[in-house]
A protein has these predicted regions:
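Bilobed "Venus flytrap"/periplasmic-binding protein-like clamshell domains
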Residues: 58-62, 72-89, 125-128, 143-197, ...
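Extracytoplasmic small-molecule ligand-binding "clamshell" domains
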Residues: 34-120
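Acidic, polar ligand-binding/catalytic clefts
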Residues: 81, 85, 92-160, 230-231, ...
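A ligand-binding cleft/hinge motif common to bilobed small-molecule-binding domains
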Residues: 106-107, 121-133, 177-184, 202-239
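Periplasmic-binding protein-like
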Residues: 58, 141-152, 198, 216, ...
């Protein structure tokens, strides 16, 4: 039905995709005192200063955003806070404070790569090209690209966007996906790049564009604010795999982060986390498979 997001996949499809996803997980060997931390690892600075710098975006609701008190909140923010607690315990630190570093969709990767932040927690999709600059943790979410339109429009599927204007946030995987689908389906539409999701939603509501393509749950976060004005198309244009952004080549830090994630997934609290941030719903079969794969043993 138009305007509703369906995240549950058939069992056969979910099983197949889960098998593929299995290759994307790296098992965190148990950390021990006998495993020395390399001198150039971010862990050295984190342990010395007892501060870990986490980059976040304010426009990635419900994965990362600011509340009325200007405090970072969201699904991935919660996960990263659990990881920080784990790192503190892994290295027996008396305290480990979080320094929040605001970033944009354009600066999120460079902030980690240049050392302004130790990790980025939001809605960043894993791609091979991005691994040339930064690294990723094990997967924390699986999503798909969708399109939001005005509820009173005559657009009912992606094919109806022929001859229309589609907004995408510049530099996102969604931009690439939309262009690929337009070419694949031989559709002539104009792709309009914007700086962030707020600008895209404003353009859609003002009639400056006919659709806004992004990750479906991010679109749902915008739709819930304007339930009567906006509708979600049924098309799934791609599978987006989210992870925490980490410094490239820092295996020790990545191991510590993945250990924290594995501990959280094994604790069996993933459904509570999902329900908190995704409108009280339950994770679909594919996401449940991801959570199961994330319960890596020490």
């Amino acid at each position: 039905m138009r305007g509703k997001c369906l995240y549950r996949l058939g069992a056969g499809i979910a099983f197949f995709l889960a098998a593929v996803a299995c290759s994307l997980f790296v098992s965190p060997a148990a950390w021990s005192a006998d495993t020395p931390v390399p001198a150039d690892s971010r862990l050295k600075t984190i342990a010395a200063k007892k501060v870990i710098r986490i980059a976040y975006r304010a426009d990635a609701r419900p994965f990362a955003f600011l509340n009325d008190n200007k405090e970072p909140l969201g699904y991935t923010i919660d996960l990263c806070q659990q990881v920080v607690k784990s790192i503190q315990e892994q290295f027996k630190l008396p305290e480990l404070k979080i320094e929040w570093v605001p970033v944009t969709v354009e600066t999120r990767f460079s902030a980690v790569a240049t050392g302004k932040a130790d990790m980025e927690c939001g809605s960043s999709t894993v791609t091979l090209s991005r691994m040339k600059e930064i690294d990723f943790s094990n997967l924390v979410f699986v999503e798909s690209t969708g399109v939001l339109v005005a509820s009173n429009s005559d657009i009912h599927s992606f094919a109806d966007l022929a001859g229309k204007k589609i907004a995408v946030v510049s530099g996102t995987t969604n931009e690439k996906v939309v262009k690929e689908h337009l070419k694949l389906r031989n559709l002539n539409a104009t792709v309009v790049t914007v700086k962030d999701r707020d600008e895209a939603v404003a353009a859609l509501e003002a009639g400056k564009v006919d659709g806004f393509a992004s990750d479906k749950l991010l679109l749902a976060g915008a739709q819930v604010k304007h339930p009567e004005a906006l509708a979600m198309l049924p098309d799934d244009l791609s599978i987006e795999q989210y992870a925490i952004v980490l410094p490239r080549g820092d295996w020790a830090f990545r191991l510590a982060v993945n250990t924290g994630l594995a501990q959280f997934f094994r604790a069996g609290k993933t459904n509570d986390l999902f329900e908190r941030w995704f409108f009280g719903s339950r994770p679909g079969l594919l996401l449940e498979a991801l959570y199961a794969l994330g319960r890596i043993s020490d």
